[in-house]
A protein has these predicted regions:
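Short acidic/polar hinge/loop motifs at secondary-structure boundaries
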Residues: 2-27
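Extracytoplasmic
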Residues: 19-21, 38-42, 54-56
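Transmembrane beta-barrel wall of Gram-negative outer-membrane proteins
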Residues: 62-87, 103-147, 171-195, 199
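N-terminal secretion/transport leader regions
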Residues: 24-26, 43, 70
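Extracellular loop and loop/strand-boundary signature of outer-membrane beta-barrel proteins
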Residues: 8, 54-56, 104-109, 162-169, ...
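Transmembrane beta-strand segments that form the barrel wall of outer-membrane beta-barrel proteins
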Residues: 47-64
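Outer-membrane beta-barrel translocator domains and adjoining extracellular loop/strand segments
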Residues: 94-100, 140, 146-158, 197-200, ...
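Short beta-strands and strand-coil junctions in structured, solvent-facing domains, enriched
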Residues: 30-33, 67, 90
Length: 210
């Protein structure tokens, strides 16, 4: 399933949450025919199946982000789920910086916020060891906002001070949404069938006010 926005924060962070990745294959060239008409390299990322027997997960908090992953059986031995959520809070670092800047530059106020989040979910059902059906969902979003509040003062014809505010507010967001249904069937040790129905799309929006 193709994904169109493959990174967060201009490539500093991957769109893929490592807590839910089962395998990753990189093909620089000579990749298999199943990747169709791709002209460049291919990165094949597979979300791991959840545990069919017990519940467990991970939780981590870092300086700029937090993540959560949980998996387990919906029907023990037959159906499992795996979900992962990740979000940054870089705005908690930028807000104090701009607060200090605005304190020493009182006529003009500036503020900038950036954050990204992504969510993964996978449900797998085993009809048998060689026949399984899985549903995948992924959504990721980046959001950037910049605010510039300027105070202008000038004198009118009566020599009175006139104060005017000029506010620029820019909001930019972009992301992906993906859903797929996969049916995998192993006919023999050397032959298998995979059928995939999917939707994959990207979006972006920009708003500007003055």
């Amino acid at each position: 399933v193709p994904i169109y926005q493959v990174s967060h924060l201009a490539g500093l962070f991957s769109s893929f949450n490592t807590d839910v990745i089962g395998s990753l294959d990189f093909y620089k060239s000579g990749f298999p025919a199943r990747y169709g008409s791709k002209m460049s390299s291919v990165v094949d990322v597979n979300t791991k199946e959840g545990s069919f027997n017990d519940f467990h997960g991970t939780f981590a908090i870092g300086l700029i982000d937090g993540r959560f992953q949980f998996e387990g059986p919906l029907w023990k031995g037959k159906t499992s789920f795996n979900v992962g959520l990740r979000r940054t809070w870089t705005e908690t670092l930028t807000l104090p910086i701009f607060a200090v800047m605005n304190k020493f530059n009182r006529p003009d106020k500036q503020n900038a916020r950036y954050a990204f989040s992504d969510f993964n979910a996978k449900i797998t059902h085993k009809f048998s060891e060689t026949n399984r059906l899985s549903a995948n969902f992924y959504t990721g979003r980046d959001a950037l906002r910049y605010l510039n509040d300027n105070l202008h003062e000038h004198y009118d014809e009566n020599n009175e001070v006139i104060s005017e505010r000029d506010v620029v507010d820019i909001a930019f967001s972009w992301g992906n949404i993906l859903g797929s249904l996969n049916w995998d069937y192993e006919i023999s040790d050397r032959m298998s069938v995979r059928n995939i129905a999917y939707y994959s799309g990207s979006y972006s929006s920009l708003s500007f006010s003055n």
